[in-house]
């Protein structure tokens, strides 16, 4: 065989390799497009199909890390068995779970989600703001900075003021909001959704007449007296 002759097997291999390179390039392009579409869909997702959570602003830097906002209102208890993982759950779902701890709503996740969804509609109608933003501001305002613990000295129990950890501050704020909702709607003509909206708006405006803010002020007042 002369040097000018080419091996047909080599030509076939080169041709096949070229086809493989094209296939790989096409697959990578399709994968990149799929990833981009998924990211875009995630960015455009809205809570309850209505409320944008991508531009929520925080005023309290100490609790910002523990007030998570996502467009997902139900994660199927994914973090239930992991300590401190609750801070990765959306604050809206945590509020829903808190409301479920009352007697009538225990275990009724869909019912409680409907209450929160209706409350958000009411908040938007009254304030013309994003209700998720109003909730975040309400949680920040209702989170106590000080509370008391009881220490025993020689058999005597003495109250002592302590600073509240940021994660517990958020826990307490959600508890106050849920308790205020239950108190406002129990044996009352006011619905749970209206009661919840009223408590959240009051907390967001730092209204001392609001149950959540009142409980926060009471906790800090008792702690100040125990210093």
From Swiss-Prot:
Cellular component terms per the entry's GO annotation: small ribosomal subunit
Biased composition (Low complexity): 32-43
Keyword presence, rRNA-binding: yes
Gene Ontology MF: a single term: rRNA binding
Coiled coil region boundaries: none
Entries under CDD domains matching the protein: uS7_Eukaryote
Pfam families, sorted: Ribosomal_S7
Bias kind Acidic residues: ranges: 1-12, 20-31
A single BP term in Gene Ontology: translation
Domain of life: Archaea
Gene3D superfamilies linked: Ribosomal protein S7 domain
Keywords: Ribonucleoprotein, Ribosomal protein, RNA-binding, rRNA-binding
SUPFAM superfamilies: Ribosomal protein S7 (SSF47973)
InterPro entries: Ribosomal_uS7, Ribosomal_uS7_arc, Ribosomal_uS7_dom, Ribosomal_uS7_dom_sf, Ribosomal_uS7_euk/arc
Segments of this protein annotated with the region Disordered: 1-43
Assembly with partners or alone: Part of the 30S ribosomal subunit.
Job of this protein: One of the primary rRNA binding proteins, it binds directly to 16S rRNA where it nucleates assembly of the head domain of the 30S subunit. Is located at the subunit interface close to the decoding center.
Similarity comment text for this entry: Belongs to the universal ribosomal protein uS7 family.
The protein's name: Small ribosomal subunit protein uS7
Gene behind this protein: rps7
């Amino acid at each position: 065989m002369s040097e000018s002759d080419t091996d047909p097997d080599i030509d076939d291999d080169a041709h096949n390799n070229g086809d493989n390179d094209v296939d790989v390039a096409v697959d990578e392009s399709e994968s990149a497009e799929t990833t981009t579409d998924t990211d875009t869909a995630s960015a455009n997702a809205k809570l309850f199909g209505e409320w944008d959570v991508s531009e929520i602003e925080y005023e309290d830097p100490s609790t910002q890390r523990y007030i998570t906002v996502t467009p997902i209102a139900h994660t199927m208890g994914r973090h239930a068995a992991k300590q401190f993982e609750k801070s990765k759950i959306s604050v809206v779902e945590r509020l829903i779970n808190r409301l479920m701890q009352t007697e009538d709503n225990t275990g009724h996740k869909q019912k409680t989600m409907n209450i929160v969804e209706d409350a958000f509609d009411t908040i938007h109608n009254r304030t013309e703001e994003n209700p998720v933003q109003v909730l975040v501001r309400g949680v920040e305002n209702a989170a106590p900075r000080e509370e008391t613990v009881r220490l025993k000295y020689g058999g005597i129990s003495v109250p002592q003021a302590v600073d509240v950890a940021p994660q517990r501050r958020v826990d307490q704020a959600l508890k106050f909001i849920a308790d205020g909702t239950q108190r406002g709607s129990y044996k009352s003509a006011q619905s749970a959704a209206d009661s919840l909206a009223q408590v959240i708006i009051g907390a967001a405006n730092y209204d001392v007449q609001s149950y959540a803010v009142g409980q926060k002020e009471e906790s800090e007042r008792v702690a100040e007296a125990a210093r």
